[in-house]
Amino acid sequence: MKCPYCGHLDNKVIDSRINKDATITRRRRSCLACDQRFTTYERLEVMFPMLVKKDGRREAWDRHKLVVGIEKACEKRAVSRDKIDEFVDDIEHMLQDYGAKEISSSIVGEWVMERLPALDEVAYVRFASVYRQFKDVDEFMSELKNLLDARGGGDD
């Protein structure tokens, strides 16, 4: 592993830790040339199905896109980055379990919509407003009513 400080290739691992679900190894390394320490992460490369967009285009799965979308929905909410990472990990596990080479992006979107209220209800409403592309206030209110009904808080 190349040292990010001096570019030297020789270093030693001084600590290794595996995350809770044994999918990522974090290693602390020390450069043998400059003695600087740095951290590397190893993650198993998993092949995810290709996403088929509404217009028929095919696109490779991009974890970062979902993370950014969830972060935007959770902006100024008490949702930690760890919780967001766990949420996206769960979606990725579902993609792995799907068992096909392609999946409609709308299926993935629905998975996100089904699980987001458990993470944060306000984030759900924010995400839904973009994902569902509400045309008017009535559609937005209908989605809010569905959320309230799902948690047993509807007034009807």
From Swiss-Prot:
Nucleotide-binding recorded as keyword: yes
Pfam family, one: ATP-cone
GO biological process, one term: negative regulation of DNA-templated transcription
Family (UniProt): Belongs to the NrdR family.
Organism: Desulfotalea psychrophila (strain LSv54 / DSM 12343)
Cited PANTHER family: TRANSCRIPTIONAL REPRESSOR NRDR
Ranges of residues in domain ATP-cone: 49-139
ZnF segments: unnamed: 3-34
Main function: Negatively regulates transcription of bacterial ribonucleotide reductase nrd genes and operons by binding to NrdR-boxes.
Cysteines paired by S-S bonds: none
GO MF annotations, alphabetized: ATP binding; DNA binding; zinc ion binding
Co-factor remark: Binds 1 zinc ion.
Keyword terms: ATP-binding, DNA-binding, Metal-binding, Nucleotide-binding, Repressor, Transcription, Transcription regulation, Zinc, Zinc-finger
Alphabetical list of InterPro entries matching this protein: ATP-cone_dom, NrdR-like_N, RNR_NrdR-like
Domain of life according to the entry: Bacteria
Entry keyword ATP-binding: yes
Protein name: Transcriptional repressor NrdR
Cofactors named for this entry: Zn(2+)
